[in-house]
Amino acid sequence: MMTRFNPQTTLLVVALENELPRAMAAGWNIVYTGVGKINAAMTLCDAIAKYQPQQVVNYGSAGALRPGLSGLHIVTRFLQRDMDVRALGFALGQTPFEDDIEISTKGEGLSCSSGDQFVSAPPEIASDLVDMEAYALAKICRQKAIDFHCFKFISDNADGDAAGDWSQHLATGAKLFAAEILDESPTKTA
């Protein structure tokens, strides 16, 4: 993936410790948010005040909505799939009185829609991946002018088998992320 980060200036943000055990991120500032956008937002705001990072790296699991996706991916487009105020004339995913439906970061990558439900059937908003936290994290980083980087490991296909697949693939994703991103990062900063 060739993306490198400095452990001293980077904050790792992960929903659950079983997605990336603390021992695998030794030497890094890491916080666990808990599940969902509100938990993610509260934890990230507190962590930014405490650590004052130059960049935030979000790692976690995600369900794939596009056939054939597997492994570890960079995500650069973020949507909020459960914001639904269409009855008042706003587009699905649009927060009322805000212009942006999508948050984009630098570079090429996949899209991820976040919402406060574990997806086991395709949602109405089209995206490559689904998760439960990334949109909130990306939005906070944009508002605070902090570089945001997101890596997602495909744990399931966001279908009827998603719950069982998710738990089986967490360790594989953590090992891959640690090997490709964390273990090599002290050599060059992003």
Regions picked out by a protein language model, each given a short descriptive name:
Residues 17-189:
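Glycine-rich phosphate- or other oxyanion-binding loops that anchor nucleotides, phosphorylated ligands
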Residues 3-11:
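Extreme N-terminal starter segment of soluble prokaryotic enzymes
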